[in-house]
Amino acid sequence: MALETFVNSEPFTFGVELEIQIVNTHNYDLTKAASDLMRLIKDAKFPGNITPEITESMIELSTGICRTHDQALGELHAIRDTLVSAADQLNVGLCGGGTHAFQQWSERQIFDAPRFQYISELYGYLAKQFTVFGQHVHIGCPDADSALFLLHSMSRFIPHFIALSASSPYVQNVDTGFHSARLNSVFAFPLSGRAPFVLTWHGFEEYFTKMVNTGVVNSMKDFYWDIRPKPGYGTIEVRVMDTPLSVDRAAAIACYIQTLARYLLIDRPLKLSEDDYLVYTFNRFEACRFGLEGTCVNPQTGERRTIAEDILDTLDRIAPHAAALGSRAALDEIGALAKARVNDASWLRTIFKQEKSLNETVRQQCLRWRE
C-alpha cells in the first residue's frame, strides 16, 4: 500500500481528539454503552465528531479544524454537553482520566468494527488492556517537509505534554507511583515510541515503503508513535497525552502545542540531529513517573532541570507567538500548573486521600467532566 499524498494545510490550525471513559452510576466501574450512546446522538447537531473506540467502554470526541483557543473551547463544550445529555438518558457517567482506576481489563468487550476486531486478533489481550484514554492534537503544516521538521522539533517537548496532562496514577485498584501509567500500556506495542529520524518526505516515503514490503505495516495507523504525520489531513498528530479531567484543560494543552508549533516553524530555534533522541526515553520516563517534578535533560547542552522549570522557560520564549494566536489565556493556565507543580494525577490522589474510595474518586471525576 502506497503512502497517502501529504495534503498541505493551513499552518497552525489544530484539532483535538479525546477518548472518554463510560462508567455505570452504581459503583462507577466501566460499562458497555458506546453503541447505545452512538444511537442516541446520531441525529444530534454539534460541531466536530463523536466516534466509537476499541472497546464498548470508551468513546471519542473530536473538534473540527480550529484556529483559536476560544473556538476549540467552544466546540469541546458543545460536544461534551451533547454526550453528557445522551449519557444521562442511559443513566451512565462520563469522565476523563488516562486510565480507569479499578476496572479489570479482562471484562472489556471489543467494539464490533472490522479494524478493532483485526487489532484484537493481532494483539490478543493487549487490545483489551488498551482500554486507556488519551488526548491527541493535530497541528496543520504547510508542506510535508515542514511536517517532519516540526515532528522532530516537537519531540523535545514530549515530557511537557505528558506531565501537564497526566491523569492516570491508578491501575486495577493500585496506585502505580506514576503520574501517567497509561503510556506503559502503549509501550507494549511493537511499533510504539518515536518516529525514525527522517527530515524529507521523500526519505519518509522510502522508509514507509520498506516497512510495507516487510509485511509489518499496511498503513500509517499501524504506527503507535508518540508523534506521527497524518498526510491525509496535512498534520502531525501528538499522541502522548492522557485525557485530562476537563475539556478546559484539554483546550489549554492543545493551544500550548499550537503555540509551540508556531514558534518552532517560524523561528526555527533548534538544529535537529539524531543525537536529540539520546535522552528521549529518559525524559519521557521522568515525565510519566514524576510528572511536573520530573527531570528533563537538554540533549544538546546536558543541562538538567525540572520539567516544570523547562515549561516556564518555554512559555517566556513563545510569548510573542501566544499573542499572535490569541492563546495567552490558555498559556496562563499552563503556567499556573507549572508553577504549582500539580496536574490531574495530583488531584486524583488528593481526592482518594480524602475519600479512601476509588469508586468515589471516579464519581468525582464524572462531576468534574461536567464543569
Swiss-Prot record:
Pfam families: GCS2
One Gene Ontology MF term: glutamate-cysteine ligase activity
Catalytic activity: L-cysteine + L-glutamate + ATP = gamma-L-glutamyl-L-cysteine + ADP + phosphate + H(+)
InterPro entries, per database record: GCL_type2/YbdK_subfam (IPR050141), GCS2 (IPR006336), Gln_synth/guanido_kin_cat_dom (IPR014746), YbdK (IPR011793)
Top class in the EC scheme: ligase
EC number: 6.3.2.2
Coiled coil (residue ranges): none
One Gene Ontology term from the biological process aspect of the record: modified amino acid biosynthetic process
Entry annotated with the keyword Nucleus: no
Residue pairs linked by disulfide bridges in the UniProt entry: none
Protein name: Putative glutamate--cysteine ligase 2
Lineage: Bacteria, Pseudomonadati, Pseudomonadota, Betaproteobacteria, Burkholderiales
